[in-house]
Amino acid sequence: MRAVRLHAKWDPRPEFKLGPKDIEGKLTWLGSKVWRYPEVRVEEVPEPRIEKPTEIIIKVKACGICGSDVHMAQTDEEGYILYPGLTGFPVTLGHEFSGVVVEAGPEAINRRTNKRFEIGEPVCAEEMLWCGHCRPCAEGFPNHCENLNELGFNVDGAFAEYVKVDAKYAWSLRELEGVYEGDRLFLAGSLVEPTSVAYNAVIVRGGGIRPGDNVVILGGGPIGLAAVAILKHAGASKVILSEPSEVRRNLAKELGADHVIDPTKENFVEAVLDYTNGLGAKLFLEATGVPQLVWPQIEEVIWRARGINATVAIVARADAKIPLTGEVFQVRRAQIVGSQGHSGHGTFPRVISLMASGMDMTKIISKTVSMEEIPEYIKRLQTDKSLVKVTMLNE
């Protein structure tokens, strides 16, 4: 079968030390410290086969390009990949996907029915392949699994004709049938994963909101835009998005944003205070990936606003120092939380239900492409911000 594969050279930086979970020449939890000169290309690879009774084979229908895919293929001036996390190459990329079950092991249980997965069942899947038995998993934190693997990062992913996953990571999309027809069902299904990342950030880690609260989202990428839709559906009074791209600001309005800010032309602090009548926001989402640039403005809003007890949730991956002023968070009773992943807490089924109830995330898909075009668009998305989500659509 055909698949989009990433190859890179294992060439650790001088200061890198092999960690306890790293495997020399194969796998690291610090990708940007090790992998150099990435190449992305379409190749022929063997079709996956069921090896455990709990596994399913999925015929991939749709798979979106994530910023992580872009950063695994993008390099700094020394040729090292930008993505800082868990990676093991070569690997088939792709983790924002949906498809249909074409084979199911005898113990592959569908959590929607508590019965074996049906052949032809439309599904999506988590990319965080948690073990379920380490201490973080046992305490209910699968996104921080000590034995974590990740689909499309160190386990072969879904920019392919077929992908194999354990049934415990798969979620039925039957609820979307009748709401989305034809390819749109699978396009919507491919957006469950990134939308769940946003849900985990603003609802699970950020603590959610009370209806009537104000929220501010910095960064109008897919995660930021998903947060706009989720928080508006959760009852936010004023959803404010800050984003330089006009295309993305307009999409935010379509998804429910009450106000949008162009930070290159407007004073972010004054705009937020004006839109909220001086109260500020209960929740801020940092989704820009450049926290060192936006943090001073977030702090100033928190300091000057009449409202207290704000939460700042950091969701964008960035190996950057934040210029934090502790006094601001002490006096204004504010807090910072980090957010990683999308697993646990019933996040996937809740996102699917939101989509079934009318939260249409397919609006963010700028273009559908073939598998052969994926390497080109992974490269193009390094610089082209007019495209929000590019999604592979298989026949």
Curated annotation (Swiss-Prot):
Protein's GO biological process: inositol metabolic process
UniProt-recorded name of the protein: Scyllo-inosose 3-dehydrogenase
Major enzyme class: oxidoreductase
InterPro entries: ADH-like_C, ADH-like_N, ADH_Zn_CS, GroES-like_sf, NAD(P)-bd_dom_sf, PKS_ER, Scyllo-inosose_DH
Binding site for Zn(2+) 1: 66, 95-96, 193
Similarity remark: Belongs to the zinc-containing alcohol dehydrogenase family.
Keywords per UniProt: Metal-binding, NAD, Oxidoreductase, Zinc
The organism's taxonomic lineage, starting at the top: Bacteria, Thermotogati, Thermotogota, Thermotogae, Thermotogales
Keyword Cell inner membrane: no
Residues annotated for Zn(2+) 2 binding in this entry: 131, 134, 137, 145
Gene transcribed to yield this protein: iolM
Active site: 68 (charge relay system), 71 (charge relay system)
Record's function text: Catalyzes the NAD(+)-dependent oxidation of scyllo-inosose (2-keto-myo-inositol) to 3-dehydro-scyllo-inosose (diketo-inositol), and thus probably functions in a myo-inositol degradation pathway together with IolG, IolN and IolO. Has no activity on myo-inositol, D-chiro-inositol and 1-keto-D-chiro-inositol.
Single GO MF annotation: oxidoreductase activity
Assembly notes: Homodimer.
SMART domains noted in UniProt: PKS_ER
UniProt pathway annotation: Polyol metabolism; myo-inositol metabolism
Catalytic reactions of this protein: scyllo-inosose + NAD(+) = 3-dehydro-scyllo-inosose + NADH + H(+)
PANTHER family recorded: ZINC-TYPE ALCOHOL DEHYDROGENASE-LIKE PROTEIN C1198.01, ZINC-TYPE ALCOHOL DEHYDROGENASE-LIKE PROTEIN C1198.01-RELATED
